[in-house]
């Protein structure tokens, strides 16, 4: 075999550059998760209006909440995993205080611009009263489901919540994160502008969802 016909030996390529590129791409995602789960590291000039829930409470199994759609079909809140959820609870007749929460949630959602698809709105109804047509029309796009108040109490109010205080469910607006954890509670009679700003900050600071 002559020198001209001998196979050329190719040097082995190092995987190091490829590994470094992969790690560089992964680093911001890892950092986002770490910062998200450590709110004390968030910028101090960005004080939350809502109250962070510590420890966060995961969405229970479907059977534990017993959620059903308005036409009686089972509904799993975890089907919305991957989205930030604005959640409120009230009676089907939806008095003015209820409509105000739905209004705040809808406007906070609509105001998120390019991030609008990262959010979902859920209203949990605690009785069998029919929902007024004007509410159904005004808040299209809100997921409306029913559940018993006692099934919601521990998840939304915590294990120490009074067992006979169903009215405590009717005031706040809550936030469930894209990983399926209840993580933020807005106060009764929340200020709509402050809620919207908090949601904007959450979406800005988080790469999840």
Task: Give residue spans per PLM region.
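N-terminal Lys/Arg-rich, disordered targeting/topogenic segments
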Residues: 1-12
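Hydrophobic membrane-insertion alpha-helices, especially the h-region
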Residues: 16-36
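Conserved helix-turn-beta segment immediately C-terminal to the redox Cys motif
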Residues: 102-122
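Structural beta-sheet core signal
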Residues: 88, 121-124, 175
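N-terminal "domain-start" segment that seeds a small globular fold
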Residues: 30, 40-77
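Short, internal strand/loop/helix patches
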Residues: 122, 127-171
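Short active-site neighborhood of thiol/selenol oxidoreductases, capturing the structured segment around
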Residues: 77-105
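Thiol-/selenol-based redox modules, centered on thioredoxin-like
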Residues: 169-209
